[in-house]
């Protein structure tokens, strides 16, 4: 037996450790590899650079409202391809694909519940559903949210994350801008607070309607907010845009929004503002945070 064969015979192969898919993810901004459970615990905010990643509509609502208080509204409403629209793909096929990918019927989820014990109605966009585009179902669900807030005599909160009106529904989509704005006008007559939270991105017909009609317009850090996108504007005016143009920090300097709030601080900030507006006792900041349930972070992180 040669010396090479003797060495090979004494080698014991080790089993390669397998890491379940989805345990690790990467920050979109700084590129840092992050432990998925830790990121979820931090509400999809990078602990290294504070970049606010996109959050699903349901996780956002569960992180906001008191655990056990959530009741979904308008879940029976489903989109229809009334125009038999087709571009490079049939609209009904795009809907089916988005529904399968996200598990949602459309791009807006509405729930009622309590926030630190205070009754509220909250809506959140699912950006992964066709870019959070606004069609007839989104408009109908938003109006349902407004009507429920009036019925319960409570505030309304909406988290926007949308590319704008849904082109596949043409005029029916554009009509939702007027429909939602008219519904909010009735709510304003009742003197009920409506707080709009602008997240990345809030663009097009959504930013031109109910997203900017809040009694208070709050934005998350570095959120892209506007009508047309920066690239489209640059190509139209043939000029270089200012740094941070259309970002929330730029907008607050120009007086277009009221405040910027980090996501981990959003729940208490909203509750404090609404308590003042509704003449209710201030929320207890020491109360345990309820909401989205994430797996506990192990004592030791798995090896990358």
From Swiss-Prot:
Which pathway does the protein contribute to?
A: Lipid metabolism; malonyl-CoA biosynthesis; malonyl-CoA from acetyl-CoA: step 1/1
CoA carboxyltransferase N-terminal domain sequence ranges:
23-292
UniProt-recorded Gene Ontology molecular function terms: acetyl-CoA carboxylase activity; ATP binding; carboxyl- or carbamoyltransferase activity; zinc ion binding
Q: Which GO terms describe its biological process?
A: fatty acid biosynthetic process; malonyl-CoA biosynthetic process
Where would one find the signal peptide in this protein?
none
Reactions that this protein is recorded to catalyse: N(6)-carboxybiotinyl-L-lysyl-[protein] + acetyl-CoA = N(6)-biotinyl-L-lysyl-[protein] + malonyl-CoA
Q: Which family does it belong to?
A: Belongs to the AccD/PCCB family.
Q: How does it assemble?
A: Acetyl-CoA carboxylase is a heterohexamer composed of biotin carboxyl carrier protein (AccB), biotin carboxylase (AccC) and two subunits each of ACCase subunit alpha (AccA) and ACCase subunit beta (AccD).
Record's function text? Component of the acetyl coenzyme A carboxylase (ACC) complex. Biotin carboxylase (BC) catalyzes the carboxylation of biotin on its carrier protein (BCCP) and then the CO(2) group is transferred by the transcarboxylase to acetyl-CoA to form malonyl-CoA.
Name assigned to this protein: Acetyl-coenzyme A carboxylase carboxyl transferase subunit beta
Organism per entry: Shigella flexneri
Q: Coding gene?
A: accD
């Amino acid at each position: 037996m040669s010396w090479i064969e003797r060495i090979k015979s004494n080698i014991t192969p080790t089993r390669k450790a397998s890491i379940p898919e989805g345990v690790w993810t990467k920050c979109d901004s700084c590129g840092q590899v992050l432990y998925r459970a830790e990121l979820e615990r931090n509400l999809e905010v990078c602990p290294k650079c504070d970049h606010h990643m996109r959050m699903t509509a349901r996780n956002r609502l569960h992180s906001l409202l008191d655990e056990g208080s959530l009741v979904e509204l308008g879940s029976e409403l489903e989109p229809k391809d009334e125009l038999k629209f087709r571009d490079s793909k049939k609209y009904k096929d795009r809907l089916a694909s988005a529904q399968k990918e996200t598990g949602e019927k459309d791009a807006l989820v509405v729930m009622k519940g309590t926030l630190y014990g205070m009754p509220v109605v909250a809506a959140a966009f699912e950006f992964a559903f066709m870019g959070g585009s606004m069609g007839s179902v989104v408009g109908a669900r938003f109006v349902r949210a407004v009507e429920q807030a009036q019925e319960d005599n409570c505030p309304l909160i909406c988290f926007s994350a949308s590319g704008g009106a849904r082109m596949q529904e043409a005029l029916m989509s554009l009509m939702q801008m007027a429909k939602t704005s008219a519904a909010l006008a009735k709510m304003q007559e009742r003197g009920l607070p409506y707080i709009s939270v602008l997240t990345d991105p809030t663009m097009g017909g959504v930013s031109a309607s109910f997203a900017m009609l809040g009694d208070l317009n709050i934005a998350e850090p570095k959120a892209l907010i506007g009508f047309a996108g920066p690239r489209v504007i640059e190509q139209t005016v043939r000029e270089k845009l200012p740094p941070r143009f259309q970002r929330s920090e730029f907008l607050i300097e120009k007086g277009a929004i009221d405040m910027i709030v980090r996501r981990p601080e959003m729940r208490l900030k909203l509750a404090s503002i609404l308590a003042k507006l509704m003449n209710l006792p201030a929320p207890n900041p020491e109360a345990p945070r309820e909401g989205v349930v994430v797996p506990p972070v192990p004592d030791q992180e798995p090896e990358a």
